């Protein structure tokens, strides 16, 4: 997990508290991710990935939005909704 990182100003416990998921984890950002709400699908380049069982929240490089999506067994992510800030994304889980 050398590439795994927390968002600036956040702790893992705060992420767990806000999301209500005590099993939340920080995942390696080196994985395939795409925005499937557009056609054609847009490739996302994750900077931060937070895992919540079969869901995840992704913050792409050079993008201020947070994308929620499905986390698959192979580690890939399909994102289908976006939030302006992390707090709202966590509450939307």
Where does each model-flagged region fall?
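Aromatic-residue detector
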Residues: 7-10, 75, 80, 93
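Short linear motifs in intrinsically disordered/low-complexity regions
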Residues: 4, 22, 29, 63-64, ...
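Short aromatic-glycine-(Arg/Gly/Cys) micro-motifs in beta-strand/loop hairpins
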Residues: 15, 51-78
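Negatively charged, low-complexity tracts enriched in Asp/Glu with abundant Ser/Thr
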Residues: 1-48
